[in-house]
């Protein structure tokens, strides 16, 4: 939750742990996968609004959600890179 700034990926509302929901960016019902790169934290309201819409459909209806998502994706991308660097460093250290 820290990696997303504790905010909803779509509306940027502050998220409390008890009210955060997981959203599949590309819905499972439409061929999306249950993998880390396809799962984000969202508030319940945004998750319900998005439903099984594809990101392009949702962002066409709610452009501000698209802008927030772009900001969030950048944050997550950096966080994932940091995690990957740590994992690689640890793997090399164990192999040595």
Where are these regions (language model features)?
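Short, cysteine/histidine-rich loop/knuckle motifs that typically chelate Zn2+
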Residues: 9-11, 45
């Amino acid at each position: 939750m820290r990696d997303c700034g504790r905010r909803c990926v779509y509306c940027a509302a502050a998220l409390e742990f008890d009210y955060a929901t997981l959203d599949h960016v590309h819905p499972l019902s439409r061929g999306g996968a249950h993998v880390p790169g396809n799962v984000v934290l969202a508030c319940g309201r945004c998750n319900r609004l998005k439903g099984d819409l594809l990101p392009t459909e949702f962002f066409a209806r709610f452009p501000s959600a698209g802008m927030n998502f772009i900001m969030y994706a950048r944050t997550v991308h950096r966080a994932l890179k940091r995690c990957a660097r740590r994992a690689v460093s640890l793997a090399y250290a164990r192999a040595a």
